[in-house]
Amino acid sequence: MTVVEAIKMPNEHVFVPGGENSRSFRNALGAFTTGVTVVTATTPEGPIGMTVNSFASVSLDPPLVLWSPAKSSSRHPAFSEATHFAIHVLSADQDVLSARFTRNGRAFDDLDWEINDEGVPVIPGTLARFECRRAAAHDAGDHTIIVGEVLRAAHRDGDPLCFSGGAFGRFSRQ
C-alpha cells in the first residue's frame, strides 16, 4: 500500500497534478471559493481592466496585497508593466460588472468610472477598492505574482460576489 492509498478517503480522486491531470487540478482549485475582483490600470492606449479571482492580502504593515495575472492573457504585458493599479472587490450584485472585464474590448464604454491621483481608472460603488503602487513582481510558472503597496482603500457594507466551481454565487452567513 502506498502512502497515497493509505490516506485516500472514499469517493476521493487522488492524482499527481500536470499533464493529463490538468483538468482535475483545475477542479480541485475550483473547490476553493474566492471573491471576485476587477483590476484596472492605464496604458498609453487608455484604461484597461480584467476580472481576477487571484487576490489576497499579504501584510497589514506595510499594507500589501497581491494578485496574479496569467501570462497567457493578452493584457498580461500591460499589467505586469503598470506602476499603479486598482483592485476592486465586487459585491454580490455585480456579476454583470465582472462579465464586462472577462474579455478584451470595450469594458469601460458606458461605465461610470473616474481617474485617481495616479492616473488609474477607479470604479465607484464596488464593495472595496485598493489603490496600489506596484511593490514587486515575481515570476510564478504560468502567472506573475504582482504585489501592490496600498496607497488608499475604500470599503462599504454589503455581501461579496463569490466564485466557486466555475460559477458565481453569494456568501451565506450562518
UniProtKB/Swiss-Prot annotation:
Listed GO MF terms: FMN binding; monooxygenase activity; riboflavin reductase (NADPH) activity
Upregulating conditions: Induced during growth on sulfoquinovose.
Record-given protein name: FMN reductase (NADH) SmoA
Purpose: Part of the sulfoquinovose monooxygenase (sulfo-SMO) pathway, a D-sulfoquinovose degradation pathway that enables the complete utilization of all carbons within sulfoquinovose (SQ) with concomitant production of inorganic sulfite. Catalyzes the NADH-dependent reduction of FMN. FMNH(2) is then transferred to the sulfoquinovose monooxygenase SmoC.
Tagged with keyword Oxidoreductase: yes
E.C. numbers: 1.5.1.42
Source superkingdom: Bacteria
Annotated family: Belongs to the non-flavoprotein flavin reductase family.
